[in-house]
Amino acid sequence: MAKLSLRKKGDGGGKSAAGKALGAVLWTGAAIGAAALANAVIFYKTPPLTSKLDGGEIRYFPTPDGDVFYKKAGDGPPLLLVHGIGAGASSAEWENVWHALSEKYTVYALDLLGFGKSDKPSLFYTAENYLSLIDDFCRQVLRVGDGRGEADVIATSLSAAYVIALSQRDPSIFRRLVLICPTGIEELASDPTLSSRAVHRIFKAPVVGTSLYNLIASKGGIRNYLKSRLIADPSKVTDEMVETYHVSAHQPGGENVLPSFLSGYLNIDIADEFKQIVDLPLLVWGRQAVETPVGNAEAFLLANPNAKLEVIEEAGMLPHVEQPEAFLAAVRPFLAAADPAPAAQEAEAAVAAAG
């Protein structure tokens, strides 16, 4: 005798399709909510960032997009320090040369918008944002350009490319350029592609993008990146260094620039501009640089035979961090060669005071 089934046709003996879908939605919502909460906790638990540059004056430069933090120290010709771009980057990278440079120069070290102690607005960041920022900072804070004198500048990586571009937009802004592992000819010179634009959209997506950022900018992620890509000697990647990058990376809004950096919107091609530099630019490269290897210096030297190359041994992308004495030994004579004689300095000071 056949058994009577109480199951309705199409029942399947389990959850309905609608029930399964609802369950999936609930689980997805819970996962997203948990990720959002985790992201919020990471930023909430991060302490305020303290400048690693001892001494000097703390100041802020107001811009239409937010306030830019900078420190000023020393007395003498103006010297601008512009840090590189990446998760956790800030003016802290100048810590090992800050005091030495301020002995002879009025040194300005800024945190670019979106980094360090500067404001971090939610913008669609492009190279032009930083070109405009550095240009305005030089004119309004250093008071150079437009016939008012020039500033020396030391800049790292992508920021060095911005400085090269600005030096040709207005040759009256900068006097001597020190370019540390610059990009813009063979590295970080191309426009965004379709795939890189997709990366930008993913990193800007709510929750998902922030989660990816927090993974990259975790202490483990930062430590690994410093050891494998930036610093030649892994033993110099200290807990303090990792903490500095981590705290800087997780200030409110710290995730806003990385999508543009990873997707190429901050790239700039400066091959033509570098060819046009008349005054001797100094290229400083770490022998063990990985991100922008020392072999890339050849393209710069071919583009402009006036350029001078100094290679720092036992250093990677940040020779001023790893080998500050060797870095200063290369940079000081280069800058001093352009300094006016003491009598001329006194005359300039008298004219400035009279004006």
Description of each model-found segment:
Residues 277-315:
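Conserved loop-alpha-helix segment in the C-terminal half of the alpha/beta-hydrolase fold
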Residues 305-355:
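Catalytic active-site module of serine/aspartate enzymes centered on a nucleophile-bearing elbow/loop
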